[in-house]
A protein has these predicted regions:
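Conserved glycine-rich cofactor-binding loop
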Residues: 9, 16-17, 40
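Substrate-binding pocket helix/loop in short-chain dehydrogenase/reductase
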Residues: 96-97, 104-109, 135, 217
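Active-site helix of classical SDR
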Residues: 120, 156, 164
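Residue(s) in the substrate-gating loop at a strand-loop-helix junction
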Residues: 140
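Short C-terminal tail/terminal secondary-structure segment
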Residues: 145, 236-237, 243, 248-263
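Short, small/polar-rich loop/turn modules that mediate ligand/substrate recognition or access, typified
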Residues: 172, 177, 247-249
């Protein structure tokens, strides 16, 4: 199926690895011109080279920390014509509530929420003029099922849903859509590294870890396995396409059924 993304300019924040990289790769595979982002130039260069090698597609890069307003301004000056904005950049860290200082709440909000808000604010005027655009926030199942071990993270993921829905309301009646995507447990590089550490200390295989994880930690999962980054990316690519023109203001789950709700 042709998603109609040929030559559309897409920016994916936090896209040198994991879900973000998979999204950038999927969009490039559909013919979009993709701008990859990471904190360091070597990471960005490596991601660009991998996308070009895999997809035979052109890709560009922007290195910088998008939790900073100054970096968002630099990005906009370098790439002012973005038509598809995917706000994937974010941070997480398990920490007990009593140990989360005020500065940490602010840091998480800056990184996970304001980074996307700033970019949407910068790119929205041109999208309005063109009467076409896509803004997608990569949230999490943690937006709905707040994890007790990282309440500050869950708060930011819920805030993304509010921003996404409110912005969709603000552009009602235009050719711009705004949606959020809620991945569930996903087999990212971080998961791989964690399992490798377990294998060294507990002689536990990935399969054994996965089985135990979904029995004890995410028993409501319907697929009983980690999703792949590519499975999340497929949903994002569709939402970014002209084919998804009737989908806006939605919180779309790619959580493997972890959230135990029909709505």
């Amino acid at each position: 199926m042709d998603l109609g993304l040929k030559d559309k300019l897409a920016f994916v924040s936090g896209s040198t690895a994991g879900i973000g990289f998979a999204i950038a790769t999927a969009l490039a595979g559909e013919g979009a011109r993709v701008v990859v982002n990471g904190r360091t130039q070597p990471a960005v260069d490596a991601a660009i080279a991998e996308i070009r090698s895999r997809m035979g597609a052109d890709a560009h890069g922007f290195a910088g920390d998008l939790s900073l307003a100054s970096t968002a301004a630099l990005l906009f000056r370098a790439h002012p014509d973005v038509e598809i904005l995917v706000n994937n950049f974010g941070i997480f860290e398990p920490k007990s509530f009593e140990d989360i200082a005020d500065a940490e709440w602010v840091r998480f909000f800056e990184a996970n929420v304001l980074s996307g808000v700033r970019l949407a604010r910068l790119y929205l005027p041109a999208m309005r003029r063109a009467n076409w655009g896509r803004i997608i926030f990569i949230s999490s199942e943690s937006a709905v099922q707040i994890p007790a071990e990282m309440i500050h993270y869950g708060m930011t993921k819920t805030a993304q849903l509010a921003v996404s829905r409110g912005l969709a309301e603000a552009v009602a009646g235009t050719g711009i859509t705004v949606n959020s995507v809620l991945p569930g447990p996903t087999k990212s590089r971080g998961v791989d590294e964690f399992v490798e550490a377990l294998a060294r200390t507990e002689s536990k295989s990935f399969e054994a870890f996965e089985k135990e994880f979904f029995e004890k930690v995410r028993p409501t999962s319907l697929i009983k396995r980690f999703a792949s980054p590519a499975e999340v990316a497929s949903m994002v690519a569709y939402l970014a396409s002209p084919l998804a023109s009737a989908t806006t203001g939605a919180a779309v789950r790619v959580d493997g059924g972890v959230i135990k709700s029909a709505f």
